[in-house]
Amino acid sequence: MDKFRVQGPTRLAGEVTISGAKNAALPILFAALLAEEPVEIQNVPKLRDIDTTMKLLGQLGARVERNGSVHVDASDVNVFCAPYDLVKTMRASIWALGPLVARFGQGQVSLPGGCAIGARPVDLHIYGLEQLGAQIVLEEGYVKATVDGRLKGAHIVMDKVSVGATVTIMSAATLAEGTTIIENAAREPEIVDTANFLNTLGAKISGAGSDKITIEGVARLGGGVYRVVPDRIETGTFLVAAAVSRGQIICRNTRPDTLDAVLAKLREAGADIEVGEDWISLDMHGKRPKAVTFRTSPHPGFPTDMQAQFSLLNLVAEGTGVITETIFENRFMHVPELIRMGAQAEIESNTVICHGVDKLSGAQVMATDLRASASLVLAGCIAEGVTTVDRIYHIDRGYDRIEDKLRALGANIERVKEHE
């Protein structure tokens, strides 16, 4: 297993080009199964989860290749089962189920893996597909869905906001007979991006980005070319990198309008921020950040995927900040690792109280999930001495060449292969 060795402290400064959003590229790749003609998807990040998805689509019989863009031709899909050996590393595989049952009348997906943060049941996906008329059984570790003829449009009220289930229902409903309405739908930018992709292929989806999405079913979807939205979480991570190191940064190829809650908290922390249509600049003018208090909540609230990075910000800030995590359980696993580097914090159930310290010290730490691993790498950049971050396969699942981008900002970071 690779690890990162980081020598600090450094003040990070410079420019970074943001990659396409993993959380939009994944549902879009799975939604390409609905298309009867070839699709070209641009701005797809180079990540382990993307590679796994491309491999999975290939196993289902789609022709998939990458040459700059990702090209998917699902016209000859003839296998309707996503096997355990690919699904076990990535919970996003459940997104194959809706398109398979909607287009082919059958699909089965092994129960998924992914980050070890709390319970992420597939119940809401199953509930949604059942409302559309699919018969679903769970057996031998697989979710198996079938339907006679086409799925039927339905009025579906979600009892919990779920990005994953909203994507499943919206994708499947594009080929259903009649109209589907999803109430209490997730509002994330990645939902909007997936809807825009499907509409490019001929779907009739309106209301994405609000809590009520309407899908008028169509008989078939064709091909098209689509560009994935920039990654707001990668953008936020690099903005925090500059903030915690008292540095400055310009993020290019990004979408400031998807980051309102994060930018507001960075301004509160003392950052000088300017935005253009596709760029954000942040300058700390050499100052230490101020602690901030917030609760994570579904979009447009503060994103849970930025919570670990802001925990780090609070732990090196002036003052005390309180962070309450309302989305996932077990999402403070980075905090004990940061305490080993000299941070001061108490965890009380779903809240962490962060007491800012003036400096951290390098230590050997272990990544436990994707965003936690990013906060540990950033901690290494600002800590005095050497930090090694183990289990960085987590970070490769969600960040496109993070060490190259940090190095361009002045970080002293190297990837150490296991045999060295």
Swiss-Prot record:
Pathway membership, UniProt: Cell wall biogenesis; peptidoglycan biosynthesis
GO terms classed as biological process: cell division; cell wall organization; peptidoglycan biosynthetic process; regulation of cell shape; UDP-N-acetylgalactosamine biosynthetic process
Residues that coordinate or bind UDP-N-acetyl-alpha-D-glucosamine: R91, R120, P121, V122, D123, L124, K160, V161, S162, V163, D305, I327
InterPro entries given in the database record: Enolpyruvate_Tfrase_dom (IPR001986), Enolpyruvate_Tfrase_sf (IPR036968), MurA_subfamily (IPR050068), RNA3'P_cycl/enolpyr_Trfase_a/b (IPR013792), UDP_GlcNAc_COvinyl_MurA (IPR005750)
Location of the protein in the cell: Cytoplasm
Reactions catalysed: phosphoenolpyruvate + UDP-N-acetyl-alpha-D-glucosamine = UDP-N-acetyl-3-O-(1-carboxyvinyl)-alpha-D-glucosamine + phosphate
Function: Cell wall formation. Adds enolpyruvyl to UDP-N-acetylglucosamine.
UniProt name for this protein: UDP-N-acetylglucosamine 1-carboxyvinyltransferase
